[in-house]
Amino acid sequence: MSFIKEFREFAMRGNVVDLAVGVIIGAAFGKIVSSLVADIIMPPLGLLIGGIDFKQFAFTLREAQGDIPAVVMHYGVFIQNVFDFVIVAFAIFVAIKLINRLNRKKAEEPAAPPAPSKEEVLLGEIRDLLKEQNNRS
């Protein structure tokens, strides 16, 4: 089997394609969540606590000196990333909870009893014949 053919079979297997789709959708979902946090949640939250823009929260470790830029820790951006994480984690939690509930409902449905085997059918016929013989006597 050639290398290219093996690679094609690997790349087109169902679980690899599903994984690729999941990664692409996850990246798009991450952008949506980042926008939700940065553009929708943080502005009203900052307004509620006094018109604060969290992106501006920073701690300067060293001031700029000539051509050397300042060394700054932007902890406001970190706060936004924490909000991003919490929202993504909550969304995943809710999705998994729904999937588990659906799987539980499927598991609770009683399965149809299996069809009797040939031996069971023959034993049933023998039993019925013996009952008939006992009833005649």
UniProtKB/Swiss-Prot annotation:
Q: How does it sit in the membrane?
A: Multi-pass membrane protein
* Record keywords, A-Z: Cell inner membrane, Cell membrane, Ion channel, Ion transport, Membrane, Transmembrane, Transmembrane helix, Transport
The chain's coiled-coil residues are none
Top-rank lineage group of the source organism? Bacteria
Q: Tell me the PROSITE patterns matching this sequence.
A: MSCL
> Among its keywords, does the record have Magnesium?
no
Can you list the GO cellular component terms from the UniProt entry? membrane; plasma membrane
Residues passing through the membrane, by range: 10-30, 76-96
Q: Where in the cell is it found?
A: Cell inner membrane
One term of GO molecular function: mechanosensitive monoatomic ion channel activity
Instruction: Report whether DNA damage shows up as a keyword of the record.
Output: no
Where it mainly occurs, coarsely classed, is membrane
Which terms under GO biological process does the entry name? monoatomic ion transport
- Alphabetized Pfam families for the sequence: MscL
Q: Which residues form the signal peptide?
A: none
Q: PANTHER family of this UniProt entry? A: LARGE-CONDUCTANCE MECHANOSENSITIVE CHANNEL, MECHANOSENSITIVE CHANNEL MSCL
Q: Which family does it belong to?
A: Belongs to the MscL family.
**HAMAP family from the UniProt entry:** MscL (MF_00115)
NCBIfam families registered for this protein in UniProt: mscL, PRK00567.1-1, PRK00567.1-4
Subunit structure, as described in the record = Homopentamer.
User: What is known about what this protein does?
Assistant: Channel that opens in response to stretch forces in the membrane lipid bilayer. May participate in the regulation of osmotic pressure changes within the cell.
Q: What is the protein name for this chain?
A: Large-conductance mechanosensitive channel
Provide the species name: Salmonella typhimurium (strain LT2 / SGSC1412 / ATCC 700720)
User: Source taxonomy lineage?
Assistant: Bacteria, Pseudomonadati, Pseudomonadota, Gammaproteobacteria, Enterobacterales
Q: Which gene encodes it?
A: mscL
